[in-house]
Every structure is written in structure tokens, then in C-alpha cells.
């Protein structure tokens, strides 16, 4: 009778299911690469065949052809430094999320200024002391007038643009 005394050796090998999960994760990462913009792809440490395959992916329109191409990208991903790719993608996602959060905060400021009157204007000037209060009040008044007369929101866009410029100046982006 053969007895197994070396239990650690039994668990060192990956199961077939674990290998499949890892390969599917590589395919998912490869599919995520196909959604990135070309200038972001240039920053990734990809081999030439993988870069070409990722750039060729949008050409495959049919479902089966696209699926097959994603599987091919997953196969090419096996030879890549996946950690570096994941790190850069997470960095891009984080910066995009931060940009969107800041954008929505500025939209809320615009809406508060147009709806809120002097109290909202005072709060805004407290947050952005470099603001030209008279100019902003004029822009807000025009936006309120447009909203009251159901006109296109051109002045509201000008308010947003001015707020965005102030925010970029405050954050040192201008």
C-alpha cells in the first residue's frame, strides 16, 4: 500500500480549474487593453505582437471573431509582465475617477450658484478667494435669465467654464 506522507507536494501544483481562472483573468485584462486609447497603450510595456493584436481588435466585429481574437490576446498575455500592466491601468482608472469627481463637484457649484443666489455666491467666494465676484455674479444673472426664459444654457456653460478655470488655477494646473 502506498501512503502519501508529503502533503505539501500535493497542494503545490495548481488545479486545472485554477489555471483556467488565471487564463480567463488574462483574457479579461487583454479585453480591457482593447478599450484603452492608443496613447495609453504606448506607455504600457507590451511586446510588439501583443501591441499589434490589441490595436487590431476593433477590426473584428463579429462576435465569434472577436471572442477568438480576445483569446489570442489572452495567449499573448501569458508572456507579459502583468503586474506592470495592471498597475498602469489602475493608475489611469484612478485619475479618470478623480477627474470625474472633480467635474461633478464643479457642476454642483454651478447649479448651486444659479439656484442659490447670494448665499451660494458667498460660499463659492469663500472656497475660491481669487474669484472676480462681479464677473461671476453677472454670469450667474445671465444664466438665471436664460433658465427663466427657457433659452439654451449658453450662460450656464460660461459659468461652468469660469468655475473650472478658477479651480485649475487654484490647483496649479494653469
Curated annotation (Swiss-Prot):
Keywords assigned by UniProt?
A: Cytoplasm, Ribosome biogenesis, RNA-binding, rRNA-binding
Domain of life the protein comes from:
Bacteria
GO biological-process terms attached to the record: assembly of large subunit precursor of preribosome
GO CC list: cytosol
InterPro entries per the UniProt record, alphabetical: DarP, DarP_sf
Write down the CDD domains for this protein, in alphabetical order: YjgA-like (cd16331)
The principal localisation class reads: cytoplasm
Q: Where in the cell is it found?
A: Cytoplasm
Coiled-coil region: none
State the HAMAP family in the record: DarP
Family of the protein in this entry: Belongs to the DarP family.
Protein task: Member of a network of 50S ribosomal subunit biogenesis factors which assembles along the 30S-50S interface, preventing incorrect 23S rRNA structures from forming. Promotes peptidyl transferase center (PTC) maturation.
Q: What is this protein called?
A: Dual-action ribosomal maturation protein DarP
Natural source organism: Pseudomonas paraeruginosa (strain DSM 24068 / PA7) (Pseudomonas aeruginosa (strain PA7))
Gene that this sequence comes from: darP
